[in-house]
Amino acid sequence: MSMEELNAQIYICKKCRLWQGAKHGVPGEGPSNAKVMFVGQNPGADEDELGRPFIGRAGKYLTKTLLEYGIKREEIFITNIVKHVSPQNRKPIDDEVRACLPYLVTQIKFVKPKIIVLLGASAKKTPRIEGIEYTQVIHPSAAMRFTKMREKFRQQIAELANRLQQN
């Protein structure tokens, strides 16, 4: 299976109830040889509308912050643990996560990143694969809402940028 075939499967997925309230599944995007993969919770309304991950307010904030520290969005692979928008953007339920995990594992195996950045608490459910470094950062939507979290988020992105420069 190719990445394009995987994306096509995600786009029309009906493995859990979330497809009923979504326009389509939202696959990840970025280079297939990215050193860094970002994994978020699930797509929001903007992402559902256009079928692309992290293009709403939180995604724009993430992209801007990464660029401030020398990380270009075009150089990272970005996806979500769950591939459909959820009602009222609630946290995904365990069976929804389980339905999407094979997609995420396949994405990880295709990209083979050196580092996986887990955005927010829900992304902690990302399976661990030997040989890959995992790091947790505050979700950009929380960083946008709370000053203390914004400062911590920026510090975490700065630390990530430093690690990338050392590799």
Regions found by a protein language model. Give the residues of each.
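A polyanion-binding, active-site-adjacent surface
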Residues: 1-167
